[in-house]
Swiss-Prot record:
Keyword Hydrolase: yes
Further remark: In the structure described by PubMed:15258613, the Asp-48 active site of the catalytic triad is located too far to interact directly with the active site His-224. A possible explanation is that OTUB2 is in inactive conformation in absence of ubiquitin and a conformation change may move Asp-48 in the proximity of His-224 in presence of ubiquitin substrate.
Annotated family: Belongs to the peptidase C65 family.
The keyword Plastid belongs to this UniProt entry's keyword annotation: no
A GO biological-process term: protein K63-linked deubiquitination
Protein name (record): Ubiquitin thioesterase OTUB2
Active site: 48, 51 (nucleophile), 224
Reactions the enzyme catalyzes: Thiol-dependent hydrolysis of ester, thioester, amide, peptide and isopeptide bonds formed by the C-terminal Gly of ubiquitin (a 76-residue protein attached to proteins as an intracellular targeting signal)
Enzyme Commission designation: 3.4.19.12
Length: 234
């Protein structure tokens, strides 16, 4: 699997390699070079509308490799998620296969502990899409179960059920801060999103939830999420 030819998630490569995506753009070059002072590597994800969910799922599970105590704690949380889905009105037979796919990869992280095995699962279209669909359903359930809070962040013309049905659950629908907030809280995953755009301004980032210590770093550029690796951690 080469850097330029990958299925869903690429091998890790030098962060400066993405300069090739914008060879003539001075602003992008400045921001990426500035970003490279804090992040050394990147994994690219396929731009299929599922990039946030796939990137978050892979990156967090990779961060757990070799950390038995954290894996055990996360497994306990994952085992509670069917209750969240049921409480939100989802029928078990409609989410069980997606839950099983996600739980299986968590067990793989615990028992195998290798990056190559994890990457293989996330690059298998069927398995990877099942994982993404589970994360989407869990995000939806978290929002539905906390409708009083989240309804303030969606358009007045759309209620929570419609928002989740059209903007969260379907594959290939892009996410916004609402979905990121919900999924990070649903699985207690702290993440930092670095924003790179064409505006001649300083780099900025957002931590979910605020003031948390991130275990996942994502790059948001041209409406797409890739995985970042912090210099002080990798």
């Amino acid at each position: 699997m080469s850097e330029t030819s990958f299925n869903l998630i690429s091998e890790k490569c030098d962060i400066l390699s993405i300069l090739r995506d914008h060879p003539e753009n001075r602003i992008y070059r400045r921001k990426i070079e500035e970003l490279s002072k804090r992040f050394t590597a990147i994994r690219k994800t396929k731009g299929d509308g599922n990039c946030f969910y796939r990137a978050l799922g892979y990156s967090y599970l990779e961060s757990l490799l070799g950390k038995s105590r954290e894996i055990f704690k996360f497994k306990e949380r994952v085992l509670q998620t069917p209750n969240d889905l049921l409480a939100a009105g989802f029928e078990e037979h409609k989410f069980r296969n997606f839950f099983n796919a996600f739980y299986s990869v968590v067990e793989l992280v615990e028992k195998d502990g290798s990056v190559s095995s994890l990457l293989k699962v996330f690059n298998d279209q069927s398995a990877s899409d099942h994982i993404v669909q589970f994360l989407r359903l869990l995000t939806s359930a978290f929002i539905r179960n906390r409708a009083d809070f989240f309804r303030h962040f969606i358009d007045e013309e759309m209620d929570i059920k419609d928002f989740c049905t059209h903007e969260v659950e379907p594959m290939a629908t892009e996410c916004d801060h609402i979905q990121i907030t919900a999924l990070s809280q649903a699985l207690s995953i702290a993440l930092q999103v670095e924003y790179v755009d064409e505006m001649d301004t300083a780099l900025n980032h957002h931590v979910f939830p605020e003031a948390a210590t991130p275990s996942v770093y994502l790059l948001y550029k041209t409406s797409h999420y890739n995985i970042l690796y912090a210099a002080d951690k990798h």
